[in-house]
Curated annotation (Swiss-Prot):
Its EC number is 2.4.2.28. This is S-methyl-5'-thioadenosine phosphorylase. CDD domains: MTAP_SsMTAPII_like_MTIP (cd09010). Catalyzes the reversible phosphorylation of S-methyl-5'-thioadenosine (MTA) to adenine and 5-methylthioribose-1-phosphate. Involved in the breakdown of MTA, a major by-product of polyamine biosynthesis. Responsible for the first step in the methionine salvage pathway after MTA has been generated from S-adenosylmethionine. Has broad substrate specificity with 6-aminopurine nucleosides as preferred substrates. GO terms for biological process: L-methionine salvage from methylthioadenosine; purine ribonucleoside salvage. Belongs to the PNP/MTAP phosphorylase family. MTAP subfamily. One of its GO terms (cellular component) is cytosol.
Length: 314
C-alpha cells in the first residue's frame, strides 16, 4: 500500500532548479482544521512506523493539481495533547509516502499588538521552550546534527505568504516572518511568561510547529507554517485571556480561508516543484559511521539515510 520513498538520487539537476519526481505535498492540520474539503479522490492509509502509529489515518488525494497527504496532527477527534502527538511517527509516515514539502496550518496566539486575531503569520524563526518531547530521529547510537539556522523553508514560506496575501480580506493581514515561541502546553501561558516572550521579540506563541520543523529537516522535507492568530495570549489588558472557546471561535472563522490558501499554494508547488536546502539536509550532517550503528537503529532510520549509507538489509 505504501509507495517507495523518494530519495535525493531521484532529483534531476537542470542547472537552475531541480525536478522532484512524483513527490507529494503534506498538510498537517492543527486545531480546528481536521480536514480540507477540496481534496478530491481521497484514499485513507493506516501506517505502522518504527515509532508507532501516526496521529490518524493518512488521507491521500488531489489538491491544486498535485497529490497531497493530509494528516490531522491531534487526530481528527482531537485526542492528543501537544506533548502526546506522535511527531516522529507522523513525519516518518509522511516521508514514506514521498512527501517532500509540508504546509502546517496551526493555531497561535499573538505576542505583538500589530498582529491581530484573525491575522495570519508565516514565521521564519522559532525559540523552543518545550521539555518533554523527542526532537530527533538520530539517537540510540546514531548521531546527526542538521542545520536549523533557517528552520522554515524560505522558498515554501514565500509561496505561502504570497498566496495568503492574494486571498486575505482587506481587514486582515498576512505577516511575513517573525519568531514562533514554542511552549510545552497543554496549559496556556502565565502572564509573566507571556510578557517575557514579548520582551524577547517573539511574534506568536504555539505548541507544535517547532517539533515538526526539526523532525522534518532530519527527514529532508521542506516545512513551513501558516500560523492562524486566534487571540492575544494573556498579555493584552484590552482583551480577555486566551481560552478554548475563543480559540475555537476564531479558528472556525479562519478555517475556510486557510484551506483556500493551502490549495492555492499547492497549485504553485505543483507547477514549480521548488527545491529546498532541506531536501539534502543530511548530506553533511551524519556524524556516526554507519558500521558503528546497530541493526535496530539502522533499520529505523534507513528511510532517511539510504541515499548516504546505502540501503539497509538485515
Amino acid at each position: 500500500m505504501i509507495n517507495k520513498h523518494f530519495s535525493s538520487e531521484e532529483i534531476e539537476q537542470d542547472g537552475k532548479s531541480c525536478l522532484l519526481k512524483n513527490a507529494r505535498l503534506g498538510v498537517l492540520g492543527g486545531s480546528g482544521l481536521y480536514s480540507i474539503d477540496s481534496i478530491e479522490n481521497i484514499k485513507e492509509l493506516d501506517i505502522e512506523t518504527p515509532y508507532g502509529k501516526p496521529s490518524d489515518s493518512l488521507r491521500i488525494g488531489n489538491l491544486g493539481g498535485m497529490e497531497v497527504v493530509f494528516l490531522a496532527r491531534h487526530g481528527r477527534h482531537h485526542i492528543y495533547t501537544p506533548t502526546e502527538i506522535p511527531y516522529r511517527a507522523n513525519i516518518w509516515a509522511l516521508r514514506s509516502l514521498n512527501v517532500r514539502w509540508i504546509l502546517s496550518p496551526s493555531a497561535v496566539g499573538s505576542l505583538q499588538e500589530q498582529v491581530r486575531p484573525l491575522d495570519m503569520v508565516v514565521p521564519d524563526q522559532f525559540i523552543d521552550r518545550t521539555h518533554q518531547r523527542p526532537l530527533t530521529f538520530f539517537c540510540d547510537g546514531a548521531v546527526a546534527h542538521v542545520t536549523m539556522a533557517d528552520p522554515f523553508c524560505p522558498t515554501l514560506s514565500r509561496l505561502l505568504a504570497e498566496e495568503g496575501e492574494l486571498l486575505m480580506p482587506e481587514a486582515r493581514q498576512v505577516h511575513k516572518g517573525g519568531t514562533y515561541l514554542a511552549m510545552e502546553g497543554p496549559a496556556f501561558s502565565t502572564r509573566a511568561e507571556s510578557q517575557l516572550y514579548r520582551s524577547w521579540g517573539c511574534k506568536v506563541i504555539g505548541m507544535t510547529n517547532h517539533t515538526e520543523a526539526r523532525l522534518a529537516r532530519e527527514a529532508e522535507i521542506a516545512y513551513t507554517s501558516l500560523s492562524m492568530v486566534t487571540d492575544y495570549d494573556c498579555w493584552h489588558e484590552g482583551f480577555g485571556n486566551v481560552s478554548v472557546d475563543l480559540v475555537i471561535e476564531n479558528l472556525a472563522a479562519n478555517a475556510k480561508l486557510a484551506s483556500k490558501i493551502v490549495e492555492a499554494t499547492a497549485k504553485r508547488i505543483s507547477k514549480l516543484l521548488p527545491p529546498s536546502e532541506a531536501h539534502t539536509a543530511l548530506k553533511n550532517s551524519l556524524m556516526t559511521s554507519k558500521d558503528k550503528v546497530s541493526e535496530t537503529t539502522r533499520e529505523k532510520i534507513n528511510l532517511f539515510t539510504e541515499n548516504y549509507w546505502g540501503k539497509f538489509n538485515k
